[in-house]
Amino acid sequence: MWESKFAKESLTFDDVLLIPAQSDILPKDVDLSVQLSDKVKLNIPVISAGMDTVTESKMAIAMARQGGLGVIHKNMGVEEQADEVQKVKRSENGVISNPFFLTPEESVYEAEALMGKYRISGVPIVDNKEDRNLVGILTNRDLRFIEDFSIKIVDVMTQENLITAPVNTTLEEAEKILQKHKIEKLPLVKDGRLEGLITIKDIEKVIEFPNAAKDEHGRLLVAAAIGISKDTDIRAQKLVEAGVDVLVIDTAHGHSKGVIDQVKHIKKTYPEITLVAGNVATAEATKDLFEAGADIVKVGIGPGSICTTRVVAGVGVPQITAIYDCATEARKHGKAIIADGGIKFSGDIIKALAAGGHAVMLGSLLAGTEESPGATEIFQGRQYKVYRGMGSLGAMEKGSNDRYFQEDKAPKKFVPEGIEGRTAYKGALQDTIYQLMGGVRAGMGYTGSHDLRELREEAQFTRMGPAGLAESHPHNIQITKESPNYSF
């Protein structure tokens, strides 16, 4: 051990370039999909970080519609986080197999509250919660001129000439029925009992977002972060009940006894849920987490733009080497890793994927988008959004202190491993994803990679020094017009 203390040399994104290779594939024809686990397939290899200025339900919905995945952060109460997951799962459905419903004796106020909370324009009405026989439907049109919200639903709901369909109705058949009768919601019934619901909005979304990442029921995929704190059991339970597809045990040091024990416990309790564990930076850590039961391991100790772990704690592994080492171990298990942190450009994404990552997790590149929950600020006439690390003092005070194993410390005793700042406002997420995936497609075209598996297996790197990096960026010119995919 003593003799090998300085034996390892490590590389990061700015130390390497991919070598171009003979290609017979055009960028527009490459396959960006990735199978992360038996139940989770993404159509782009991008995951938004579980950070309180990056991902809540709005971001997770937008990410899934683009074909990626969003991780709902845990800097909120258990019920609130579960509610955020529900918003994603109910935002879009092929067929809503478990629709909301109310009974005739409930008040219009309760209907208005339910519809407002989940942003739905109507709700089926059943005789009672046990039998669930459909007796009516309540829509915004029924409520348009209501002034007294204390009246019962039975007094205003539509009861006559209800249009319904059997439970095995396809989306194509449903669309024809909806158009024929000029209605927006089609209850699915069996022997009069409400069994499902198809809406015109969901059909329109299928057409508008054909690349969306969905579960087997046609609902958007969503992930949520948990930790190793006292509320983890109840948090995991509520998230699973809300329909979460992926649980992410999110800590700063995944190669620790507490995390390994938590992986074993969560996987035993919820074997059907895809489980991500991290963060780590070595093959040994990857091996231990996979053997404990993790389906996916998240890689990255300190590479993030808002992370100070490497300078505060003096610990980490430059990210390209960390990805490669962990991927080498993951190959032995036939499992996936996520490259988390350090990505500044689309070129870094393809480097991370070529080094062995199955997907990348992004924070700073997405924090400036409209869908992120960070507050908007105006600074020197330009629009920005607040972005902070989960190891920053503000985030730790709000609840992320357990991520850094400081759960029992008073706020004045926190030792932060991150900073708070601002990032330029970028507009809609879909525009950012378009540019990022355009860069990945271009890189795959240059390397002759038809899909991400081929990129991982066949692409080769060359190392470069500071002069090579300087040569790689625009030089000997003053940039006068900002590019949508480059800022330095």
UniProtKB/Swiss-Prot annotation:
Chain ranges of the CBS domain: 95-153, 157-216
Cofactor(s), names only, from the UniProt record: K(+)
Activity regulation annotation text: Mycophenolic acid (MPA) is a non-competitive inhibitor that prevents formation of the closed enzyme conformation by binding to the same site as the amobile flap. In contrast, mizoribine monophosphate (MZP) is a competitive inhibitor that induces the closed conformation. MPA is a potent inhibitor of mammalian IMPDHs but a poor inhibitor of the bacterial enzymes. MZP is a more potent inhibitor of bacterial IMPDH.
Polar residues: bias regions: 475-488
Keyword tRNA-binding set for record: no
Superkingdom of origin organism: Bacteria
Reactions mediated catalytically: IMP + NAD(+) + H2O = XMP + NADH + H(+)
UniProt: K(+) binding residues: G302, G304, C307, E471, S472, H473
Keywords: CBS domain, GMP biosynthesis, Metal-binding, NAD, Oxidoreductase, Potassium, Purine biosynthesis, Repeat
EC main group: oxidoreductase
Sequence segments annotated as region (Disordered): 468-488
One Gene Ontology MF term: nucleotide binding
Pathway assigned in UniProt: Purine metabolism; XMP biosynthesis via de novo pathway; XMP from IMP: step 1/1
Binding site for NAD(+): D250, G300, I301, G302
Xref: InterPro entries: Aldolase_TIM, CBS_dom, CBS_dom_sf, IMP_DH, IMP_DH/GMP_Rdtase_CS, IMP_DH_GMPRt
GO biological process terms on file: GMP biosynthetic process; GTP biosynthetic process
Record function comment: Catalyzes the conversion of inosine 5'-phosphate (IMP) to xanthosine 5'-phosphate (XMP), the first committed and rate-limiting step in the de novo synthesis of guanine nucleotides, and therefore plays an important role in the regulation of cell growth.
Family: Belongs to the IMPDH/GMPR family.
Oligomer status and interactors: Homotetramer.
UniProt-recorded name of the protein: Inosine-5'-monophosphate dehydrogenase
